[in-house]
Amino acid sequence: MKILIFIIASFMLIGVECKEGYPMGRNGCKIPCAINDNICKTECQAKWKQSDGYCYSPGMSCYCTNLPEDAEVWDFSNIKCRG
């Protein structure tokens, strides 16, 4: 019985994922950053209170985690950057 409860609980946890992505500036572009810069955390939390952020080094752009599902983030297939 305990194993059955454990399996059901495991399946429920697998489906729990938070949205992540690059926040956009006013011009629709990704927000540039430098490594070890706190601007990303500040930018992410200014838009979405419960989120966190860091500078993603390969692209040198801010990246936000723990976003709500309706959060608008930069999307490669729909680039709106006017920069």
Swiss-Prot record:
UniProt GO cellular component terms: extracellular region
Keyword field: Disulfide bond, Ion channel impairing toxin, Neurotoxin, Secreted, Signal, Toxin, Voltage-gated sodium channel impairing toxin
GO aspect biological process, one term: defense response
InterPro entries per record: LCN-type_CS_alpha_beta_dom, Scorpion_toxin-like, Scorpion_toxin-like_sf, Scorpion_toxinL, Scorpion_toxinL/defensin
Stored Pfam families: Toxin_3
Expression by tissue: Expressed by the venom gland.
Listed SMART domains: Knot1 (SM00505)
Broad class of where this protein is predominantly found: secreted
Signal listed as a keyword: yes
Disulfide bridge partners, by residue number: 29-81, 33-55, 40-62, 44-64
Subcellular location: Secreted
Ranges where the LCN-type CS-alpha/beta domain occurs: 19-82
One annotated GO molecular function: sodium channel inhibitor activity
Annotated signal peptide: 1-18
Role description: Beta toxins bind voltage-independently at site-4 of sodium channels (Nav) and shift the voltage of activation toward more negative potentials thereby affecting sodium channel activation and promoting spontaneous and repetitive firing.
Family: Belongs to the long (4 C-C) scorpion toxin superfamily. Sodium channel inhibitor family. Beta subfamily.
Domain remarks in the Swiss-Prot or TrEMBL record: Has the structural arrangement of an alpha-helix connected to antiparallel beta-sheets by disulfide bonds (CS-alpha/beta).
Protein name: Putative beta-neurotoxin RjAa17f
The species this protein was found in: Rhopalurus junceus (Caribbean blue scorpion)
